[in-house]
Amino acid sequence: MSVTTLNGQPTLNISGPGQTALSRLDPLKKVFTKFFSSIPQKVRGHVVAVIGELIGTTAFLFIAFSAAEVALASANDNKGDKVSYETKSISTTQILFIAFGAGISLVVNAWTFFRISGGLFDPAVSIALFFVGAIDLTRCVLLCIAQCLGAIAASAMAYGLYHGGLHTATTLKPGMSPAQGVIVEMILTCQLCFTVLMLAAEKHEATFLAPLGIGLSVFIGELAGVFWTGGSMNPARSLGPAVVTLSFPSYHWIYWVGPIAGAGLASIIYKLIKALEYETAQLSEGEMHAHPVEDSEKASGHTGPCECMCFKVAAQGQSSAASTLQVATTDARKSSSLVPTKSTKSGNSEVKKTETVVEEPAKTQPKPAPAADDGFFGEMYAD
């Protein structure tokens, strides 16, 4: 094990007899690096995003489907170790369990893949990001394909691992029309996509917490929609079980039209509040006039403290040598700051002492800094 310096930063090299599992994977890393180095940078970026969304969507939906299977299953003593899913109506406890499983699964996986592909896992979210210009059309199409494939893979895994079949298909509640289902899915997906746009696409100090807010958005969306439409909010989530079970209801289209319409509605709302400069909405009119510099900073996305040049110079002046500022001030204010000179004799030569006096500002307490500093910065603040 050794430490080297790369671009001024210390780098840990693992080698020698004390190699770890990470170091033993280096040959595999070299193979991948050699393979992907031949791919253009833009194409490589698409490949990374597609792989991230494929794996992330599979992991997210597999956990969500598994939680739903647990919630829907009920033990049946008369059938031995068999599991019965026959219930008259889904209970609120089951809905809560399903919603929590989907929400917490999204939090964990989105946080994991956030820096790889964005952790979208939903074609509707990808389309919303395309509508606002966050991603281009090529990336959007590739992500949607990867997300659909991931949903099919997750459904196949759940179908093959859990006996009793797959019971996570999204269906309308009896008596609910497709038109009502479209509206429900549109509203719930709009809320989810708007959360993504404000917490992830809109950069701010809490962007790193975006997966938590997005997961909570899925949680409340499932609470509101599972009973009525299955709580899809995700075309891929509805496509996966339908493909694996080869069961496409006649109203399957609502799980595409509703979420895509919701993505468009969320994009319109986002564009509207951006055009209205929502950053300044919390400031009163008096604050807008009293703090024009702070307002402009907030409008440009800078929320840090004001760092005017005069304050920077003042901070530097307090820490620099007082003699430098004294010379500059003396040259600039000779007519008002010089008093008659006093002469002293040293042998046959005469030495003149010059004392500088700076006029104190009226009604101002004396400052501990040198007098020359007060005069210099006094003129700057006066301007």
Curated annotation (Swiss-Prot):
Positions in the Cytoplasmic compartment: 1-46, 115, 162-180, 229-252
A cellular-component GO term for this protein: plasma membrane
Motif NPA 2, residue range(s) on this chain: 234-236
GO MF, any single term: water channel activity
Principal subcellular localisation of the protein: membrane
SUPFAM superfamilies membership: Aquaporin-like
Keywords: Membrane, Repeat, Transmembrane, Transmembrane helix, Transport
Record's subcellular location: Membrane
Signal peptide residue numbers: none
Compositionally biased residues, Polar residues: 332-349
Function description: Water channel required to facilitate the transport of water across membranes. May play a role in the vegetative growth.
Stated name of the protein: Aquaporin-5
Species of provenance: Botryotinia fuckeliana (strain B05.10)
